[in-house]
Amino acid sequence: MKALRRMMAGLVCAALLFGRAAGEASFDFTDGMPDVPETAAPTENPAPTITLSPAFEMTVIRPAAQQHHGTILIYHTHTWEAYRQTDERYQETEKWRTKDERYNVVAVGEALTRALTALGYTVVHDTTAFEPPKLADAYARSLTMLEQRTASGEAYDLYIDLHRDAISSTSTIRRTVNIGGEDAARFMVLVGKGTTGGYREMPDFAANLHIAELLTDKLEAQCEGLSRDVKVRTGRFNQHIAPRCILIECGTNENTLEEVLCGIPYLAQAIAETLDALEAETAINNVE
């Protein structure tokens, strides 16, 4: 349990970034988390915003004026992407991947869902495993899900395909940034042009790139180095399905899950600020 205390301390390392004021919301990141042996190493300086009865709880203090409205879809085309093994080892499906949703990107998506919900958003987190039976066809299967949602009349203010990036152990890419004494994994937004593959339906690349750049700027404004530069690829990545589609890489295979979760409150805040900026731009354009 002490090892879990250390892991959860990372979750709250940025909780006060929202500012202390009248409104507050709580969300528990530990639903479904595995039990940890009592022999695990103790933590230093545990975060004061964790309540240990009966489960760890993260309390985000924020002004009532920051309550947001909007809908967000989070899903994972590469559902089994996972992180560097720690003392809390998971069963690998293959190298850097696991079916266990407590340890793969689904756990990150769940944490982001709770953080955004606490900010007032309506979030749909689709945890469908799109990788089996063959990883190469995962985008075709996630596209089917998106098409079915669109056909049923669903529409969202932001579509997020949440991934984990892959780098080599010798890569010079910086793995983490320090936030309040804790190491947090870095994020990266990816957008596709759709220029390869012979597609007839193309993404709104310029609009998606604008969103990616806004989100990157909002992350950097909170903590320099928290975001890597926007990555532009020639593929489509299903970003043609609707306006405002982005792919977010949450850390890399060289990060731990703890490091990724440490940055989630910052990512949620950056997403909120990005959507606020887009709403303001729309209002200005409507006036003009």
Which residues does each predicted region cover?
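Short, charged, low-complexity patches
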Residues: 105, 204-208, 212, 257-264
